[in-house]
Amino acid sequence: KVDGEYKRFAFTEDGISPRSRLGLDNGVFWNTGDESDEFGHITEDPQVRIQMMDKRMSRLDLVTKRVPDDEQVVSFGVHDYTIISWGSTKGPILDAISILKKEGINIGFIQIKLIHPFPSDYVKSLLKNAKTIIDIEANHSGQLGKIFKQNVLREIDYFILKYTGRGMTSTEIYDSLKKIVENNANKREVLSHGA
């Protein structure tokens, strides 16, 4: 039971407001797409807007403090050649680097799981000995590569991208990585395998 009026968006020390559970007495609140006060009522008051935005942004610091490094970024080893990626590319990347390892070619891989706030210091520490950074993504523009460059202040050496709407395969990643290791690759490799 909530005593008094429930403030769904109450200002708190850590920036996280208490949540109501279904059926909680006096736990009714409003959600809007516009700025709201602590009760969820729409407001255009500039001071409330400033307080609410400051509250939201304070959570970014909280995330950095509370989420362990190994949950922000997963390292599958770092070598001279190291891949950065995110999302659905993980499986085919691990398969491709496993095949390459059997051929005596070691390629590292770090999977970025937290994009904002970007774990810059941790990523920098992981990649300090990597000589070549390869960005593998399922989009046209290499979005993670841009975020990486902005936060880590380091260039991506090679992009392997696929944006056909089909998933990447370990075979096409393997082929692209092999070209990079053999110094026979374009800076931007666009994949198109798949029916």
What are these regions (language model features)?
Residues K1-A195:
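Flexible, low-complexity linker and terminal segments
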